[in-house]
Regions:
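Amphipathic alpha-helical coiled-coil/heptad-repeat segments
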Residues: 1-14, 165-215
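A short glycine-rich beta-alpha junction/loop motif
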Residues: 5, 40-42, 90, 106-114, ...
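Non-catalytic DNA-recognition/assembly elements of restriction-modification systems
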Residues: 7-32, 164
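Proline-centric
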Residues: 10, 114-125, 138-139, 143, ...
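Structural detector for helix-capping/boundary residues
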Residues: 19-22, 53, 111, 135, ...
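Sequence-specific dsDNA recognition surfaces
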Residues: 22-39, 53-83, 103
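A short beta-sheet element
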Residues: 51-52, 67-135
Length: 215
């Protein structure tokens, strides 16, 4: 509701503005001749190598990333990743999105991932992250597929993606703040649930094997 304009926050007014994602963004990905061989995937190295399988719940699972050496990192500055960047999968399971906010070392992209950077003040990357997670973008992908499965998202496809955004960055940031706080609450609850599940599993092992007897 918040990213579609159907519900407005108090204190904001004015019609939402229609923009085109591609016209207001720099969209980059690893090009074919820069392709990596599996031998170049390192367990430790200079830079993270972000692949589509590293996306988890809107973030990147850094613990699951491979690495590449310095030469591969500096080869293409266009796909060097920074905090505040937006990533979008374009191969395999297309349309997965991640917002980068906890990067603590150099990172670059493997094939199959776009980095999306705003080049105008039409939108903030964090607001666009929530748009791309919403039904707005899912409906767009569904229209692209025309009912069939699509296995690749091209840059030319994103040229067709028009959307409506709040007219000010202040409203975008206010919406983002609410959604981020909700995500944080969900994350904390999931962590607590995971902890309790592990405790339960441990108790089951003890109780069901007779290692611990009830008094």
């Amino acid at each position: 509701m918040l990213v579609t304009g159907k519900k407005r926050l108090d204190g904001f007014s004015g019609d939402w503005v229609k923009i085109n994602l591609a016209k207001n963004s720099k969209l980059k990905a690893r090009i074919g001749w820069q392709g990596l061989t599996t031998a170049e995937y390192l367990d430790e190295g200079y830079s993270y190598l972000i692949t589509g399988t590293d996306f988890k719940d809107g973030r990147i699972n850094w613990n699951g990333c491979h690495y590449v050496n310095y030469d591969r990192y500096v080869q293409d500055p266009n796909i060097q990743v920074s905090n505040g960047d937006l990533l979008l999968t374009k191969d395999g399971t297309i349309g997965k999105v991640a917002y980068i906010s906890d990067l603590n070392r150099p990172a670059t992209l493997n094939s199959g991932v776009f980095v999306v950077k705003p080049i105008t003040d039409a939108y903030t990357a964090h607001f666009m992250f929530y748009v791309l997670k919403s039904s707005v973008f899912k409906d767009f992908l569904q229209q692209l597929s025309a009912g069939s499965t699509i296995n690749h998202l091209y840059q030319k496809d994103l040229v067709k993606f028009d959307l409506y955004v709040p007219p000010t960055t202040e409203e975008q940031e206010a919406i983002t703040g609410i959604l981020f706080d909700m995500d944080l609450d969900i994350y904390k609850l999931e962590e607590k649930l995971s902890k309790y599940q592990k405790i339960k599993q441990g108790m089951m092992e003890e109780l069901l094997t007779g290692k611990v007897r009830l008094v």
